[in-house]
């Protein structure tokens, strides 16, 4: 477990894996700078600005945009994280939020678990125009093994699976038991494609 940049560098030099405590989603601070500071004091080294839904001050990639990126308070959250020495994690956030955070952050940012949107067009992935900004910021995009983030074939299969579940709900009156039975039968004839380590490396 590492709590500072110096500890991360020391672990790397020793050939060890550095692990950090993270907060996955800015909803955890409930729009409170005091809560953010307390999480940092308790050992949190980074925070993902959003999770699956928007927070009042930042848009998520898997929700309908409300703030068009970061609000003024969202910018202040990024600045406070910079001041505290917490890494700003842009996985889960909308592209507009990515750009706004890169505009205001005075420290390198991370994507803790995302992939390239050019490789797999999942909304959780990072567009090329954002990736092109990382060298100047000094930030990094970290490895993810989520198959629907690295394989377009797996992503499409997930969409089809969801569409089939919707069809079954409409056709069978919406009882969850009948939907699950029909879904299991569909999966048996439409097995989930495999993703590979080569796709992770790409």
Task: Annotate each PLM feature.
Residues 1-202:
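Extended, charged catalytic domains and RNA/DNA-binding interfaces, predominantly
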């Amino acid at each position: 477990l590492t709590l500072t940049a110096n500890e991360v560098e020391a672990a790397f030099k020793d050939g060890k894996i550095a692990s950090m405590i993270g907060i996955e989603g800015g909803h955890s601070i409930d729009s409170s700078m005091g809560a953010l500071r307390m999480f940092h004091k308790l050992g949190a080294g980074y925070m993902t600005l959003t999770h699956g839904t928007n927070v009042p001050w930042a848009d998520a990639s898997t929700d309908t945009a409300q703030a068009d990126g970061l609000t003024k308070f969202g910018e202040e959250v990024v600045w406070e994280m910079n001041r505290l020495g917490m890494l700003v994690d842009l996985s889960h956030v909308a592209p507009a939020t990515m750009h706004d955070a890169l505009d205001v952050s005075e420290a390198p940012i991370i994507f803790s678990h995302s992939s390239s949107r050019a490789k797999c067009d999942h909304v959780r992935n990072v567009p090329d125009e954002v990736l092109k900004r990382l060298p100047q910021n000094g930030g990094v995009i970290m490895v993810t093994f989520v198959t629907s983030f690295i394989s377009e074939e797996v992503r499409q299969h997930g969409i089809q699976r969801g569409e089939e579940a919707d069809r079954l709900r409409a056709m069978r009156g919406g009882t969850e038991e009948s939907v699950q039975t029909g879904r299991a039968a569909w999966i048996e004839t439409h097995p989930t494609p495999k993703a590979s380590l080569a796709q992770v490396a790409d």
